[in-house]
Amino acid sequence: MANAGLQLLGFILASLGWIGSIVSTALPQWKIYSYAGDNIVTAQAIYEGLWMSCVSQSTGQIQCKVFDSLLNLNSTLQATRALMVIGILLGLIAIFVSTIGMKCMRCLEDDEVQKMWMAVIGGIIFVISGLATLVATAWYGNRIVQEFYDPMTPVNARYEFGQALFTGWAAASLCLLGGALLSCSCPRKTTSYPTPRPYPKPTPSSGKDYV
């Protein structure tokens, strides 16, 4: 039987990772303007996310522009969007499935093996969700690095990693760790031995058998 405390810990970690994926997807700070070179503008901060680009003035005023055209976006941004949304949807499914398999829940109490398998399946879905988030954030981060060191990119058009990217990496790690802990609920196979057959006891011989 799996440890109920370890199972609950995995569920909490994976759920926190799922929430972190939602926060990372919604935040606009996936990449922030790099203050490198001679043309440094400290009066404003420029950052960009999956859905919009924003400019924050030193006065506290923030102006954001939503990406209107889907076809006008680069392939990296479109793929990152898709992977993050897929990861969030998979995480939602994993929460429902693993909740049924939790020992603290009363669902499927009559069949403990099936209940444990539900927790295992939920953990596997959490792992897949974490991998989708990890691939999305790593792909986007790699694009930022390539553009930063590209000599053809102007100095005033270079960006660095934003807070949302770090949030996505942390969320992916939590989903992977929590999903792995839930997957440890896999029921072990028990070796069954055949039931020994009772043999009749030999009857003691009596003197009547001899003449």
Curated annotation (Swiss-Prot):
InterPro entries: Claudin, Claudin1, Claudin_CS, PMP22/EMP/MP20/Claudin. One of its GO terms (biological process) is cellular response to tumor necrosis factor. Residues 1-7, 103-115, 185-211 are cytoplasmic. It holds the Pfam family PMP22_Claudin. It comes from the Eukaryota. The chain crosses the membrane at residues 8-28, 82-102, 116-136, 164-184. GO terms for cellular component: apical plasma membrane; basolateral plasma membrane; bicellular tight junction; cell junction; cell-cell junction; lateral plasma membrane; plasma membrane; protein-containing complex. Keywords: Cell junction, Cell membrane, Disulfide bond, Membrane, Tight junction, Transmembrane, Transmembrane helix. One of its GO terms (molecular function) is virus receptor activity. Detected in epididymis (at protein level). Detected in testis and epididymis. It is found in: Cell junction, Tight junction; Cell membrane; Basolateral cell membrane. It is a multi-pass membrane protein. The keyword Cell membrane applies. Residues 29-81, 137-163 are extracellular. Residues 210-211 are annotated as: Interactions with TJP1, TJP2, TJP3 and PATJ. Disulfide bonds join 54-64. PROSITE patterns: CLAUDIN (PS01346). Residues 190-211 are annotated as: Disordered. The keyword Protein biosynthesis does not apply. Claudins function as major constituents of the tight junction complexes that regulate the permeability of epithelia. While some claudin family members play essential roles in the formation of impermeable barriers, others mediate the permeability to ions and small molecules. Often, several claudin family members are coexpressed and interact with each other, and this determines the overall permeability. CLDN1 is required to prevent the paracellular diffusion of small molecules through tight junctions in the epidermis and is required for the normal barrier function of the skin. Belongs to the claudin family. Can form homo- and heteropolymers with other CLDN. Homopolymers interact with CLDN3, but not CLDN2, homopolymers. Directly interacts with TJP1/ZO-1, TJP2/ZO-2 and TJP3/ZO-3. Interacts with MPDZ and PATJ. Interacts with OCLN, CD81, CLDN4, CLDN6 and CLDN9. This is Claudin-1.
